[in-house]
Design a protein with these regions (language model features):
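Asp-based phosphoryl-transfer active-site loop
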Residues: 1-3, 121
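Short acidic, glycine/proline-rich loop/turn micro-motifs
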Residues: 3-9, 73-77
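Short, acidic loop-to-helix structural element flanking the phosphoryl-transfer center
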Residues: 9-35, 43, 47, 85
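C-terminal cap/substrate-recognition subdomain and adjoining C-terminal extension
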Residues: 42-318
């Protein structure tokens, strides 16, 4: 799994964490899911960010930060805000550079609505699947005003791609409360979510997260963020009604509850139990609304790239 970590401005012991995020990352790493962090934060913040991750008990495999100081020294001021020219080449280089050892390995990408994550990750997914070729990628990067040498590096990686479906899901945290319908243009593969329990529901159903781990995320939502059982179940219903859950594996969640109850105190124990009681009817809703991500048309990236170019957005506002 690849995950993105937002810029942290507080000290490590003061940094705010999105509800359920740290627990979900801990549980994923304990489930032997590979965690690769690609952050838009500058390299100078590495110590602070790593301290925060360690404070939360999170183990990661790779941690890539943006070389903003290097960009400034080279007078590359566009690159300071550019996400397309940073994240797409980084993703392509990481995947193609790993060679045969990652053949058949699926990725779940996690980002937020504060940057161009849905756009960049969808494009990356279509490149890896062979739907977006070298010529199209070049036109997109040129239109996005990416520096020429960065374009060349990205295209070298594109030429190394052995087409296969790589990206299973793209999870977008709605940190800025963007409406989920704004992401429909990217298809069902992109899953907008409001809290990390919703992300846990998705990755559990995808087979990446054990049911006991999902329940621990739910328990944290009660203990630290004052969710009750009804709110926990509504989180499932919200994702289900938007067509991102199949309504499977509810039996696993029910079966895992007794084990969780041995280690979780009140009120989390009662609220999680209430959530589990409410999930079966919501699973029926999920089965009725499920939208398979396969076979959807590719987004018009050439049209979309203007929306995600910071300079274009700035001109449009003036």
């Amino acid at each position: 799994m690849r995950d993105l970590v937002r810029t942290a401005l507080e000290r490590a012991d003061e940094k705010r964490t999105n509800p359920g995020a740290a627990t979900l990352l801990r549980e994923l790493s304990q489930a032997n899911v590979s965690i690769h962090i690609l952050s838009g934060s500058p390299e100078q913040m590495r110590r602070r960010l790593e301290a925060k991750l360690k404070l939360d008990g999170i183990v990661w495999d790779n941690f890539t930060l943006k070389p903003n100081l290097q960009n400034m020294l080279r007078l590359r001021f566009r690159a300071l805000r550019d996400q397309l020219g940073y994240k797409l080449p980084a993703l392509l280089t990481s995947r193609t550079g790993a060679g045969e050892q990652v053949a058949g390995v699926k990725e779940t990408l996690v980002g937020d609505d504060a940057e161009a994550d849905a756009f960049v990750y969808s494009l990356y997914a279509d490149v890896m699947e062979g739907r977006a070729g070298e010529e199209l990628v070049q036109r997109i990067l040129e239109r996005g005003r990416v520096y020429e040498d960065v374009i060349e590096a990205a295209l070298r990686s594109v030429r190394l791609v052995k087409p296969e479906p790589v990206v299973e899901r793209i999870l977008i945290h709605l940190e800025q409360q963007t409406h989920p319908r704004d992401f429909q243009i990217f298809g069902a593969r992109v899953v907008p979510f409001y809290n990390y329990l919703q992300a846990a529901y998705v990755v559990h159903e995808d087979g990446r997260l054990p049911a006991t781990s999902l329940l621990r995320v739910a328990a944290e939502m009660v203990t630290l963020h004052r969710f009750d059982g009804d709110a926990l179940a509504r989180s499932y219903a919200d994702v289900a009604k938007r067509g991102h859950l199949q309504g499977t594996k509810i039996e696993e969640i029910v079966a895992a509850l007794p084990e969780l109850e041995k280690t979780v105190a009140s009120p989390a124990r009662e609220e999680v139990r209430r959530m589990v009681e409410l999930l079966p009817p919501q699973a029926e809703l999920a089965r009725a609304r499920w939208k398979p991500p396969e076979g959807e048309p590719m987004p018009d990236y050439l049209e979309l790239v203007d929306r995600h170019n910071p300079r274009h957005r700035k001109r449009k506002k003036t």
